[in-house]
Amino acid sequence: MEKRTSCSVQTSTNCDNSLETLNSAHQATGAVQMRIKNANSHPDRQSQTKSMILTDAGKVTEPISRHRRNHSQHVLKDVIPPLEHPMVEKEGYLQKAKIADGGKKLRKNWSTSWIVLSGRKLEFYKDPKQQALPNVKPRPNAESVDLCGAHIEWAAKDKSSKKSVFQITTASGNEFLLQSDIDFLILDWFHAIKNAIDRLPKNPSFGSLELFSFQRSSSSEQPSHCHIDRKEQKPENRKSFMFRLHHSVSDTSDKNRVKSRLKKFISRRPSLKTLQEKGIIKDQIFGSHLHTVCEREHSTVPWFVKQCIEAVEKRGLEVDGIYRVSGNLATIQKLRFIVNQEEKLNLDDSQWEDIHVVTGALKMFFRELSEPLFPYSFFERFVEAIKKQDSDAKIETMKSLVKSLPPPNHDTMKILFGHLTKIVAKAAQNLMSTQSLGIVFGPTLLRAENESGNVAVHMVYQNQVAEFMLTEYDKIFSSEED
């Protein structure tokens, strides 16, 4: 009886153990099914690796979470703004020649290119239509120059016999020559590219987007260092990445604070007129109005004009092609800068020994006046006067017009044309006739305010007026007190 009872108890115990085993197995199966169901219900998880790894001992290790979707998609998206195409700062046609590729010299071959300056890049196209091609990467026949670490300078004569040429040398050893016959155009390009280079770091690798590269998978966009294999990333690298990420967030907030302070400062700063009245900001000599320059110097003839004329008459009257030959543009710009800064100027200094630099600066001064030497309001009247057929009537009309000019215009004109008559007197040596000087100075001294009419016809009259002023100088300025 006791034996039967113990057997039944043992049987019951075994049954209970079997039931527990079945229940646990059922629960485990249900848990696995639940995990499978949950995994299938989230498509994003399908791309993740298996979370159960079977070791050699046949044991199941703890699940390893490799789900880093929050870091790569949510945090990074808020911190790093989407990349945008850089804004075009300048574009236009220039003559271009590539003379070196990676330090290897190339045969110089000039061609006209449509050049686009944007951010840290200078791009060359055949024409504007090629630049505008949508969604073409890379654009056909387009050449791009990285300005980071580049160097720009005015080209030496051994580089090119053309005038107004500057050279760009990139960090990779490529060399380009850019040129234009229009002085102010090539100057604008030189300063625009130089400013772009100065804004960039000197080290080409610094500032580029090498910190992170974005590697896309089917489920997420994960940031990684350019020089680290994703498969070999260690936990220390992940911590370092998160540190840099939080550091960039603080940098962004710092930049926003600086921007707000700058906006407040700019909104509170005094106006340009106030600064000019206090003498803090002064008008420059080049590019100003003739009356403004004379009023500031308490004279009717600008001091710079007098100095240039004296220098030319001292050592340039017999120089071949005086006023026709162009001087070195970089040296002319240096002279212009000194004059604008009101620094002491000595044109007898050895750096100004080339008389064509002095004449080039004088022509630039008259060309850049905000209103030409012949005022806009007198343009049509001088053109009508030069059209007269009767010589005496033409002289009298010209004389009357010159006499009615404002004192700064009248006195400066008298000194300038008096100087040019001395150039004509030496025409046998310098080969500069009245016609040649008329062509050089006509468009510089006399031009319409709005060139809406025939530019070619205007140019003919401009040259004729300047030439007539030289030919009849004594009669036009006769009976006037010096």
UniProtKB/Swiss-Prot annotation:
One of its GO terms (molecular function) is GTPase activator activity. It is found in: Cytoplasm; Membrane. It comes from the Eukaryota. GO terms for cellular component: cytoplasm; plasma membrane. GO terms for biological process: regulation of cell shape; small GTPase-mediated signal transduction. Pfam families: PH (PF00169), RhoGAP (PF00620). The keyword Membrane applies. CDD domains: PH_ARHGAP9-like, RhoGAP_ARHGAP27_15_12_9. GTPase activator for the Rho-type GTPases by converting them to an inactive GDP-bound state. Has activity toward RAC1. Overexpression results in an increase in actin stress fibers and cell contraction. The PH domain is required for localization to the membrane. PANTHER family: RHO GTPASE-ACTIVATING PROTEIN 15 (PTHR23176:SF108), RHO/RAC/CDC GTPASE-ACTIVATING PROTEIN (PTHR23176). This is Rho GTPase-activating protein 15.
